[in-house]
Design a protein with these regions (language model features):
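Hydrophobic faces of well-ordered beta-strands that scaffold small-molecule active sites
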Residues: 15-21, 43-47, 81-83, 102-104, ...
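N-terminal amphipathic alpha-helix/helix-capping segment at the start of soluble metabolic enzymes
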Residues: 1-18
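Long, contiguous binding/interaction regions
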Residues: 25, 34, 38, 43, ...
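Extended, charge-rich alpha-helical interface modules
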Residues: 253-355
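Active-site mouth loops of central-metabolism enzymes
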Residues: 15-32, 56-60, 79-85, 105-106, ...
Length: 355
């Protein structure tokens, strides 16, 4: 993807900020918010026109009626304007309205058939296309959606990290799983990746710290939900902030752009490589012990899974990790994955299938 073009060619390089309401609810609401976003120094305005809601009966957007409002915001305040699309029909209407770009939502990204239809409908266009991550933390699904657009000739492309659905209890609406966008960047280093702290956090008080964390991790910008009267919003009211709060948030962000010298960076990376190698060696050693335990259990007709033992191990690891300043959630994920592989190895021993 070395031939990608800037998302918006007339904007200065640096972090890209996009802001606007979850939904375009009325002309007055949209223009009031657009003015506030403009005054906050943001040059790209977003608003949902068609809203794919989880349950029927929720506000599903104003539809094509709202497209002229977005066009008016563009012309009145000199903003680039974008909205979400999910079908070729949406794309046709957006192009007729003269909008500057679109984003593709998480539910649509999840569906390869829908993505191919959208990619075909966008063939030959030169508007900005932003692709949100799929609902599940599947980097192949995300990169595949982007590749479909790229293969259709789209060159103004970016990804948007909005977090992932989870059955686990977390302080966030959508678990960030930062490793997924980091892996996407490793695979597609030329692709800009923005973060959407509004959808990750789900509550307005979490937007600023999540925005700062994203920039600390090297994200190329932010997409933030902003509403002139957020408490009266017809959708996602809790996660939207006022234009004034948006300006304060952007002013508070620290851009860590000072480059580390290449020699120092190389040394850090070599150290990381060495540690990773040791981790793999230790994991291989641990799996060897797990297989020996599997042999013992088979010889004594014992069940492979000993739930009490794993719970004890997990609690001890989480307690130790907390003292070391490591996230309990992270340790839980790591040890669960290790336990799963250990069980797989022991089951293979039971079946004489270990290789």
């Amino acid at each position: 993807m070395k031939d990608l073009n800037p998302i918006f060619s007339d904007l200065a390089s640096g972090s890209l900020y996009i802001a606007g309401p979850c939904s375009a609810e009325s002309r007055e609401q949209l223009l009031a918010t657009a003015l506030g976003v403009h005054n906050a120094g943001v040059q790209v305005f977003r608003a949902g026109v068609w809203k794919p809601r989880t349950r029927p009966g929720s506000f599903e957007g104003m539809g094509r009626e709202a497209l002229p409002w977005l066009r008016e915001a563009k012309e009145r305040y000199g903003l680039h304007v974008i909205t979400e699309v999910a079908t070729p029909e949406h794309i046709e209407q957006v192009l007729k309205a003269g909008l500057d770009g679109v984003w593709i939502g998480a539910r649509t990204t999840t569906n390869p058939f829908a993505m191919q239809e959208i990619a075909d409908a966008l063939r030959g266009t030169d508007i900005a296309i932003l692709v949100k991550n799929p609902v599940s933390p599947d980097v192949d699904l995300w990169s595949g959606a982007i590749e479909r657009l790229y293969n259709s000739g789209i060159r103004r492309l970016a990804a948007v990290h909005r977090g992932f659905g989870t059955h686990q209890t977390t302080p966030y609406r959508n678990a960030p799983h930062w490793s997924v966008p980091i892996e996407l960047h490793r695979r597609m280093p030329e692709l800009p990746i923005l973060s959407d702290p509004s959808h990750i956090g789900g509550r307005r008080e979490l937007v600023q710290p999540l925005a700062q964390e994203a920039l600390d991790l090297g994200f190329d910008g932010l997409m933030i939900e902003c509403h002139a009267a957020p408490d009266k919003a017809l959708s996602d009211a809790r996660q939207q902030i006022t234009p004034e709060a948006l300006g304060e948030l952007l002013h508070s962000l620290i851009l860590r752009r000072t480059p580390v010298t290449q020699d120092a960076l190389r040394d850090y990376r070599l150290h990381i490589d060495s540690l990773d190698s040791r981790l793999l060696e230790l994991l291989a050693e641990r799996m060897g012990v797990a297989r020996e335990i599997g042999e013992y259990k088979r010889a004594h007709a014992m069940a492979v899974v000993q739930h009490d033992r794993f719970n004890e191990l997990l609690l001890a690891a989480e307690a130790k990790a907390e003292k070391m300043g490591i996230s309990k959630h992270f340790v839980h994920q790591i040890f669960s994955a290790i336990h799963e592989e250990s069980v797989r190895q022991q089951v293979a021993v039971e079946r004489d299938e270990i290789r």
